[in-house]
């Protein structure tokens, strides 16, 4: 019996040292527009209207020192959104509104080719990384916040997928 434990122990140590991580819960948007992977526990707020836009939020508060958020914004029916305009100046406006120090502000494209703005901020020991992604008439905000050791933010950003661009909704609600 001891002979069998040796290889199992070696395999276990090898897996632990190679960084195998448990999977995060997978969230699929009810309308099929996006999917995301966030650490548990997840809290989902149903889509709601705020002014001229509709918001859907998914968040994770693994512990009091870190949080992850995915928020989808799209216009109410009959309105249009300029996604590129939303990306322009996002980092500066976000920092100015909250008195945060900008540590990163970069425009580029995600692996899927979608336009994105990436920002990082610091304020009173709080670290924040945000990626804003344009997808048709939707704009997604991916936010990671933490104090102390950094969580796996790249895993969070890479686990987000736009599955379908949001189309223009021409029919205003009655």
Located regions from the model:
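Short, well-structured beta-strand
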Residues: 52-82, 87-91, 110-174
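A short, amphipathic edge element
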Residues: 95-104
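Post-signal peptide N-terminal segment of mature Sec-exported envelope proteins
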Residues: 27-50
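Bacterial N-terminal signal peptides
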Residues: 8-18
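Bacterial signal peptide processing site
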Residues: 19-23
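Beta-strand-rich interaction surfaces with strong enrichment in secreted/lumenal proteins
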Residues: 26, 105-108
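N-terminal secretory signal peptides that target proteins for export/translocation
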Residues: 1-4
């Amino acid at each position: 019996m001891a002979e069998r434990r040796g290889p199992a122990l070696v395999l276990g140590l090898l897996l632990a040292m190679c960084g195998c991580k448990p999977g995060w819960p997978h969230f699929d948007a009810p309308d099929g527009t996006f999917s995301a992977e966030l650490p548990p526990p997840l809290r989902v707020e149903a889509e709601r209207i705020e002014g001229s836009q509709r918001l859907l939020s998914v968040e994770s508060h693994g512990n009091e020192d870190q949080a992850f958020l995915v928020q989808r914004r799209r216009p109410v029916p009959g309105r249009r959104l300029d996604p590129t305009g939303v990306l322009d100046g996002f980092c500066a406006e976000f920092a100015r509104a909250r008195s945060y120090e900008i540590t990163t502000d970069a425009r580029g494209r995600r692996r899927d080719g979608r336009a994105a703005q990436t920002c990082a901020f610091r304020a009173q020991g709080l670290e924040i990384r945000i990626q804003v992604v344009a997808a048709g008439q939707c704009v997604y905000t991916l936010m990671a916040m933490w104090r102390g050791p950094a969580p796996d933010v790249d895993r969070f950003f890479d686990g987000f997928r736009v599955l379908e661009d949001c189309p223009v909704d021409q029919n205003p609600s009655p």
